[in-house]
């Protein structure tokens, strides 16, 4: 039976995922991008442009570019661009068609069966419109499922005790909903949902853009406003991990360039009134379900906007969440995953990818590739693998019920790599060296450029506590399976010792992780800049400035000592490199667009 993929058709971004070798994974495009902007541009001549290229063109021709079409699904059949076949369904179909091409390129085979997600509060007309869009894109839509149900599947919550109730707080780019789910006989049932189809991260972007426009003298044209909006989104994203961001918009008008410092405090003062609107929906959903917040076992955060620290603080406050620490993006609560003091704030799943991953799991169940299992005991400590940079990547979190199965897709870190060392770890620390090593083995695969290989690593613990680790090259099907006996057989004293160590060293561990992750990102930025310079140096006026920015980043990386360095300085240097390479990025995109238009016969 052919694969059934999972699709999150989002307001601002969309994603597609599939289960391979028992592991759900996002299917990235040829450039490694895991999210597709839900943006479609309709040129005056030629075929529509979808995704990243359309988003770039938006700043030049905003009137011919459609964003947030999901907000209009099932509500209007009118074209969103004058003179074009651009109804909400038709725009969504183009996005879904692009996702199909992306999936087929990643998998190397034809796919035409999909599970597509919708907000829980979508009415029948909106659901039918979504299904119609899928069919127009060439998909056989096997099922339309609710986004909160998909998110719960991605979190592995089918292993919760019977009758457990969870809330899914889903704040995306253009929509918000709060859903209360209950697990009944292994199936999630929606007890209540409340939301707003016109409330999301777009509104925060608009508030920032409005604030920025007050810094501009006189009126802006459509292109200027589009540039302001793009800068607003970039600032919002940056301030999820930084306290300060400098917005620079050269020649916003012929005689005016905008440069302004924008802080996290500024962002939160603008965002708070918008986020406070979600509180009413949260309360109403709880009332409709006849519950209070302390009846919940978890509150799951989904949607890219929930990366904002203010969102997490507000949700934790509204739902009276228990004390929690964010470690590796997961939640640690001491001896019990559940807390008597309130629900767990679950931040352990990538908020941008959870819905697509969950939809792919549903697709795998429908195709017979996955089946439900009886869940019994729990894992005493987290299990994972060492990743590039010497960090631990958790596959099965501590206190997961067993039998349990989970996995992730990994890729090669360097060009020409022919094998991957799988180092299996157990523990609660950030750095691999601080956790217990359970074993190592190597899987060979076809030589590929950096990021070209796809190796799935799956952990499966049976009811006897025996861990089997499978690594599979999804291109050739080559695999290795290694049994490990000691994954669950750990004394209470040793467990307590590890947990106490993780708490004692939490801050230094997180500092080390932040540095390593920032350093890896910096290394990628330097490599991309060097590659671009090699191809286009002669066409750039600021090549020397880019060289200097690269040298600044490399100097900070070389001065680091034992996973410790000047993190604020490194982030600032990378931000500077990103800024000075904007002309290079535009040049690369222009050349790519020219090549695409020539291929389509639009240019000679």
Question: Where do the language-model regions lie?
Answer:
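Short, charged beta->alpha transition segments
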Residues: 89, 97-104
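Oxyanion-binding/catalytic loops of NTP- or PPi-dependent enzymes
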Residues: 1-72, 80-85, 94, 104-604
């Amino acid at each position: 039976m052919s694969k059934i993929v999972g699709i999150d058709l989002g307001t601002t971004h969309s994603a597609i995922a599939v289960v391979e070798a028992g592991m759900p994974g996002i299917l990235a495009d040829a450039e490694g991008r895991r999210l597709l902007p839900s943006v479609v541009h309709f040129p005056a001549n030629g075929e529509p442009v979808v995704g990243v290229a359309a988003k770039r063109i938006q700043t030049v021709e905003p009137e011919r570019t459609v964003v947030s079409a999901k907000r209009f699904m099932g509500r209007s059949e009118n074209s969103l661009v004058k003179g074009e076949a651009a109804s909400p369904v038709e725009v969504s179909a183009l996005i879904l068609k692009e996702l199909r091409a992306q999936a087929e390129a990643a998998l190397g085979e034809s796919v035409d069966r999909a599970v597509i997600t919708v907000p829980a509060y979508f009415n029948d007309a909106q659901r039918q419109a979504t299904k119609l869009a899928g069919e127009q894109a060439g998909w056989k839509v096997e099922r339309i499922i609710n986004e909160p149900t998909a998110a719960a599947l991605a979190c592995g919550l089918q292993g919760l005790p019977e009758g457990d109730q969870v809330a899914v707080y889903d704040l995306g780019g253009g929509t918000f909903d709060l859903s209360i789910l209950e697990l009944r006989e292994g199936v999630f049932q929606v007890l209540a949902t409340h939301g707003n189809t016109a409330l999301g991260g777009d509104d925060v972007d608009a508030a920032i853009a409005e604030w920025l426009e007050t810094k501009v003298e006189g009126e802006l044209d459509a292109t200027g406003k589009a540039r302001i909006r793009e800068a607003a989104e970039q600032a919002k994203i940056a301030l999820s991990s930084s306290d300060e961001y400098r917005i620079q918009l050269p020649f916003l008008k012929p005689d005016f360039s905008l440069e302004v410092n924008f802080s996290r405090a500024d962002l939160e003062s603008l965002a708070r009134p918008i986020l406070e609107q979600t509180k009413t929906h949260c309360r109403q959903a709880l009332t409709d379900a006849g519950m209070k917040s302390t009846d919940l076992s978890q509150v799951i955060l989904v949607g890219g906007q929930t990366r904002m620290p203010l969102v997490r603080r507000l949700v934790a406050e509204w739902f009276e969440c228990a004390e929690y620490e964010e470690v590796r993006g997961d939640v640690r609560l001491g001896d019990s995953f559940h807390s008597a003091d309130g629900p767990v704030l679950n931040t352990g799943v990538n908020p941008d990818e959870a819905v697509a991953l969950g939809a792919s799991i549903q697709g795998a169940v429908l195709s017979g590739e996955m089946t439900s299992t009886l869940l019994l005991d729990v894992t005493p400590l987290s299990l994972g693998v060492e990743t590039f940079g010497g960090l631990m990547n958790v596959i099965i979190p501590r206190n997961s019920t067993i039998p349990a199965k989970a996995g992730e897709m990994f890729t090669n870190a360097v060009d020409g790599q022919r094998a991957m060392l799988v180092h299996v770890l157990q523990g609660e620390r950030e750095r691999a060296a601080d956790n217990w090593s359970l074993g190592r083995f190597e899987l060979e695969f076809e030589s590929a450029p950096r990021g070209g290989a796809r190796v799935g690593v799956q952990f499966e613990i049976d009811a006897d506590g025996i861990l089997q680790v499978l690594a599979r090259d999804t291109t050739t099907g080559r695999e290795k399976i290694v049994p490990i006996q000691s994954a669950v057989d750990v004394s209470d004293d040793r467990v307590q010792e590890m947990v106490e160590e993780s708490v004692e060293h939490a801050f230094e561990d997180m500092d080390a992780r932040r540095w390593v992750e920032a350093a890896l990102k910096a290394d990628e930025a330097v490599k991309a800049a060097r590659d671009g310079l090699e191809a286009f140096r002669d066409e750039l006026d600021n090549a020397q400035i880019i060289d200097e920015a690269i040298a600044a980043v490399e100097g900070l990386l070389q001065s680091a000592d034992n996973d410790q360095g000047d993190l604020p300085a490194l982030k600032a240097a990378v931000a500077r490199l990103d800024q000075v390479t904007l002309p290079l990025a535009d040049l690369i995109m222009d050349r790519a667009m020219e090549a695409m238009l020539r291929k389509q016969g639009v240019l000679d």
